[in-house]
Amino acid sequence: MKYCFVFFVTLICLIANCSARPEGDKGLSAAPTDGKQIERASDKTSEENDGNTNAQGDSNSRLQDFFKQIKQFLDSLNPFKKLLGSGASVPQLPDLPTTPSLPDMPLKPEAILQNPSVPSLPNIPKPSLGLP
């Protein structure tokens, strides 16, 4: 379980690193490119933005794109959606009784000691507390 968590954290960090590359970087990217220039919030003129919200808008759009990519990735990992269609969900387990049924047996120590199926304990001498 610990290794799965480490794997997913590493994968999310790799996706975040790929999606945060500058525009001129031609390295590997998780986002598909079709040759068109993508307009970003930082490309808008100062008439459309007052300058202070420019960087915030760019980071918000990047963050939204990042979470969309994670959601698409996690949706692609769901085997039930692949098998049963887009409206499928994880099947629910049947309702089980909350308390397990135990045999009607007294749980008192006296009853356990009187039970003949339990082997008797050997007599172990008690340690003396006196010093020699």
From Swiss-Prot:
Residues 23-62, 87-132 are annotated as: Disordered. Residues 91-105 have a biased composition (Low complexity). It comes from the Eukaryota. It is found in: Secreted. The keyword Signal applies. Residues 1-20 form the signal peptide. Keywords: Secreted, Signal. GO terms for cellular component: extracellular region. Residues 36-47 have a biased composition (Basic and acidic residues). Its main location: secreted. Residues 51-62 have a biased composition (Polar residues). The keyword Secreted applies. This is Proline-rich protein sgp2. It comes from Glossina morsitans morsitans (Savannah tsetse fly).
